Amino acid sequence: MKGIILAGGTGSRLHPLTKVTNKHLLPVYNKPMIYYPIETLMKIGIKDIIIVTGREHAGNFLNLLGSGVEFGAHFYYVLQDGAGGIAQALSLTEGIAGNESVVVILGDNIILDDVSQQVKDFKTGAIIFLKEVHDPGRFGVPVFGKTGKKLLKIEEKPNKPQSEYAVTGLYVYDYTVFDRIKKLKPSARGELEITDLNNLYLKDEKLNYAVLKGPWLDAGTFESLFESSKVIKDVLSKK
């Protein structure tokens, strides 16, 4: 099993900071943002990690992270030219991931739960991780059946969310993920959407979900970047 960190994008919501570096290299409390998804994957036991990023600041990632030896890991780097969506960025890793299952995490997502058991138990299909939030309409939102347990579909940033849960930026996929991505069509904004990929798995009754209990931080805006630093500081002070 390989880990994949998607760390591309322009980081426009964090301008002007991201004019000089990739947002995933910005500090969150006492370390660069990208260290957190690396730690999430390492905690699971994954040491082969593919990092997808844009061409402009790729050298900064290499200078900071190197080969991965300092982490006890092996890093692979893949360049994404332009913005084609999360699923498109994921597709670029096929040549390295091969026929293995993958754990995918967005580079600006900080997840403090230990999800190693869910990954250890994973056999086939896909897993998404949900978190109850006060503003689900900013994210992909799961729609459940009458019992509130059976997952019916996932809606991308709905105006009227049908649940209080958000789909976080942590996913587990089996080896069929790349063939499924090839079946996707660009959305209205011209991108291959991760929500469409997850719905493909759901259509085949191969999508499971787990609910995160601990903090989930999306550090992609100034407000959330600041809040993430506060939460990390509080967590560390209690250890």
Regions found by a protein language model. Name each.
Residues 66-72, 143-146, 200-202:
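Short, conserved catalytic or adaptor-binding loops enriched in Gly and charged residues
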Residues 25, 142-144, 209:
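A structural signal for short hydrophobic beta-strand segments in well-ordered beta-sheet cores
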Residues 19-24:
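Short alpha-helical oligomerization interface
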Residues 8, 54-55, 80-81, 106-108, ...:
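Fold-independent oxyanion-binding glycine-rich loops
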Residues 82-86, 135-136, 160, 216-218:
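A short acidic, often aromatic-flanked loop/helix-cap motif at beta-alpha or helix-coil junctions
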Residues 2-5, 13-16, 27, 31-106, ...:
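Conserved N-terminal catalytic core of the sugar/cofactor nucleotidyltransferase
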Residues 113-138:
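Conserved donor-nucleotide/metal-binding helix-loop-beta segment in metal-dependent transferases, i.e.
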Residues 119-120, 150-239:
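Catalytic-core segments of class I nucleotidyltransferases/pyrophosphorylases
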